[in-house]
């Protein structure tokens, strides 16, 4: 996909963090600051789908303060799945490729303070994917309406039982990936929206890669509007059905 990449200089961090954004001017500044305050060896890639608010402007301001931030501006809203795969390709193309790539929501539903926990699980278990899980012991969701909880539980049940996937939380977007796995799987990632979460787990499962879950607290966004639409729910169900037919 065509995009404009803003930011100069070589990146050489051990960790790449992908932050897909659309209309996140109320959240992106404090999220970037929270990540920077962790003092980990990480580079941040914000992928913005030409938000009509001030998201990109805020990121550019942060770039004047931190040299480890890159901004990818895509011409239009193109889906979470393509944003994440564009982010994967960006980090895999670096001269000094990071060892791990993380994904998380830019609306502060995922707490940056949980990043070290995901990384520790990755270091200890040498996984393809570590999932920040809402559904293992210690994991929790705050602020979701009952209908959203039902949708999430149903989506996870469909993925687990129809595709034979082992993780309890197959739809969490808070993750750490090894670039060893991403290098093998990237050509098989074709999702456009939220089904990317299922597709990556399925690709790891098909290749017999190890996956682990670590508990996190998911807090429903307090600022801005939810990005999950009925179209994206249909895309998720369509992908799952296609995957079943290929099994």
Q: Residue locations for each model-derived region?
A:
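Active-site beta-to-alpha loop of glycosyltransferases that engages the nucleotide-sugar donor
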Residues: 19-33, 50
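Acidic helix N-cap motif at the loop->helix transition within catalytic regions
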Residues: 26-30, 53-62
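Short hydrophobic beta-strand elements that form part
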Residues: 16-20, 45-46, 73
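Short, acidic, metal-binding catalytic loop of nucleotide-sugar glycosyltransferases
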Residues: 33-42
């Amino acid at each position: 996909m065509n995009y404009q990449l803003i930011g100069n200089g070589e990146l050489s961090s051990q960790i790449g963090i992908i932050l897909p954004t659309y209309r996140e001017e109320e959240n992106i500044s404090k999220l970037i600051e929270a990540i920077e305050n962790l003092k980990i060896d990480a580079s941040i890639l914000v992928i913005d789908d030409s938000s009509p608010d001030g998201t990109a402007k805020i990121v550019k301001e942060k770039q004047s303060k931190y040299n480890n931030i890159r901004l990818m501006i895509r011409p239009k809203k193109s889906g979470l799945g393509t944003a994440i795969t564009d982010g994967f390709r960006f980090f895999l193309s670096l001269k000094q490729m990071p060892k791990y790539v993380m994904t998380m929501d830019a609306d502060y539903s995922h707490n940056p303070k949980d990043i070290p926990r995901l990384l520790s699980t990755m270091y200890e278990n040498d996984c393809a994917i570590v999932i920040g899980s809402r559904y293992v012991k210690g994991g929790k969701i705050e602020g979701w309406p009952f209908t959203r909880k039902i949708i999430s539980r149903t989506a996870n049940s469909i993925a687990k039982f129809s595709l034979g996937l082992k993780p309890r939380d197959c739809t969490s977007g808070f993750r750490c990936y090894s670039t060893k796995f991403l290098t093998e799987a990237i050509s098989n990632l074709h999702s456009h929206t939220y089904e990317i979460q299922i597709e990556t787990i399925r690709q790891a499962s098909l290749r017999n890669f190890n996956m682990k879950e670590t508990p996190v607290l998911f807090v429903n966004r307090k600022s801005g509007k939810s990005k999950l639409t009925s179209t994206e729910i249909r895309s998720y169900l369509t992908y799952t059905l296609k995957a079943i037919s290929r099994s």
